[in-house]
Amino acid sequence: MYKFYLITFLLLAGTIAKVSACTNFLLTRGATQDGSTMITYSADSHVLYGELYHWPAGTWPAGTMMDIYEWDTGKYMGKIPQAAQTYNVVGNMNEHQLAIGETTFGGRQELWKQTGAIMDYGSLIYVTLQRAKTAREAIVVMTDLVEKYGYASEGESFSISDPNEVWILEMIGKGEGEKGAVWVARMVPDGYVCAHANQARITTFPLEGKTSISSDRMKKIYDKEVTTVYAKDVFSFAKQKGFYPQEGKNSTFSFSDTYAPVDFSGARACEIRVWAFFNAVNSNMAPYFDYAKGHIQRDEKGYATNRMPLWIKPDRKIDVLEVMDFMRDHLEGTELDMSKDPGAGPYECPYRWRPMTFKVDGKEYVHER
């Protein structure tokens, strides 16, 4: 059967002014009706407008340099060597049907700034699309770029997909005084779906072995048995910074809970979008609704203990029209359905043109979204 990749762009992210409104759904071949891999990518805002970028394929002489401009602001970041061959890119997919999307999770603020870093998250996406053919090669390119030229953005979750595989890569910079980033990448098992929406989602992961490698053995990533890859210093850097106990076991280390701990807004405003998608395709998600509403249980390390799984197996095969509907979900049918409250007006509008939070007598409250 002819393999093809389908990516749904409901709204491409333009200049984003600190909004937490991006959502990605990731679907493997075995989870879809037509055997396609799919990812979605939205920047949900009434003041952002869709756009498509185009980079034609090219062959470049040795010594050619390319300018890097920060995607969000247009700020000049620096130069990096151009690849000898670049691929045709339209939007967030290239001629080899490699596609990349993202949502910003932020994470620990002391890791956001890295003086001299060149590669911001947007440039990382579009440079990689010009240089890689597959999801695995994209992970190599992305992690190599930040190691060589530094990482100039907040923490990011990336969706990376080709016609055969879907991966989630989560990355956060090392802050001032060090170049690069720490990261973990995991392949979504075939037949499963995954999602992220401005909250880091990778928790514990398999340690180095047959199916998992650190970046010390990056060449092994092309072995199809490998389904997890992580930065060689992802544990030691956290211990060095005091984010994880020196005596802490690597086997119980959670990337998200260490580098981007989930709080009330991370659950109620972000993870709840993941829950809505999972709930639409799997009948066993009700126990996680309390967590998605912001009621987080924690262990002695401060790790959340009632989080949703990173991926789930849907009850049925999913088609692209359903995926489009899932991206339009407003928590209909739940107690948080805003189309049914007085503010919805006669047309049951689920939107409210207002900030997400407000204060009364010094106490902060949340608006639903």
Regions found by a protein language model. Name each.
Residues Y288, A292-M327, T334-D337:
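Mid-to-C-terminal functional-domain signal that highlights helix-capping/loop sites
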Residues L336-R369:
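Substrate-recognition/cap regions that form aromatic- and gly/pro-loop-enriched pockets
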Residues F4-A13:
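Sec-dependent N-terminal signal peptides
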Residues C22-Y121, V141-D299, N306-L310:
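A contiguous strand-loop segment
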